[in-house]
């Protein structure tokens, strides 16, 4: 008999199967292969149709991006609970239109990552450009350009000194969190909608939690 409960269970089984395949037959194999080469992997798990916390846990360095503090905390939270030394961020990808962001804008974005627990900053926006290319050189979609053709290049070192000092303390310190929020992945995977697969981020699941509490 077709019932909401049975439909939810079938949907959960399908999504859990995809989850297991992505973790066991892709992410773990990738990490093992890298380890055999003496390397580690850095992975942005958010957006995957699987439990992103488990995917982050497979990575040697969980990596996050974005501007929402709740979402930013997803990767560092896994690093804290799994005993990983580093959690990184794809930083300052798109803060304004091309060449309109200044180092103050970049620092503001980096401080949000630090507040979320990130302790290993990666700049996003360094594009290869031949020396003979006319100014401003080769560009790509990311609007903050960390290269010598940007007028802030001469002062970039001062921001890096700040980043080095802050993240060195964060890397040497010990996380101290008062609250551990349950990630109710089973409930989310059972929810029916217009998509067979759901692509998860920390913010989406937190919002689902809040909505469920209101319904109850």
Spans of features found by a protein language model:
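Carbohydrate-binding surfaces of carbohydrate-active enzymes
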Residues: 1-216
């Amino acid at each position: 008999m077709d019932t909401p409960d049975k439909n939810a269970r079938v949907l959960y089984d399908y999504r859990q199967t995809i989850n297991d395949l992505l973790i066991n037959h892709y992410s773990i194999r990738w990490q093992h292969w890298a380890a055999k080469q003496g390397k580690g992997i850095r992975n942005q798990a958010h957006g995957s149709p699987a439990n992103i916390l488990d995917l982050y846990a497979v990575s040697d360095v969980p990596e996050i991006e974005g501007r929402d503090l709740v979402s930013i905390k997803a990767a560092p939270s896994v690093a804290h609970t799994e005993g990983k030394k580093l959690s990184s961020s794809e930083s300052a990808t798109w803060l304004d239109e091309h060449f309109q962001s200044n180092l103050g804008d970049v620092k503001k974005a980096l401080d949000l990552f630090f507040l979320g627990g990130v302790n290993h900053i990666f700049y996003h926006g360094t594009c290869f450009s031949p020396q003979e290319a006319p100014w401003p050189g080769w560009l790509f979609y990311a609007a903050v350009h960390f290269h010598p053709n940007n007028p802030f290049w001469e002062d970039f070192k001062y921001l890096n000194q700040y980043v080095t000092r802050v993240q060195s303390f964060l890397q040497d310190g010990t996380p101290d969190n008062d609250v551990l929020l349950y990630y109710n992945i089973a409930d989310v995977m059972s929810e029916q909608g217009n998509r067979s697969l759901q692509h998860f981020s920390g913010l989406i699941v937190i919002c689902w939690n809040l909505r469920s509490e209101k319904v109850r």
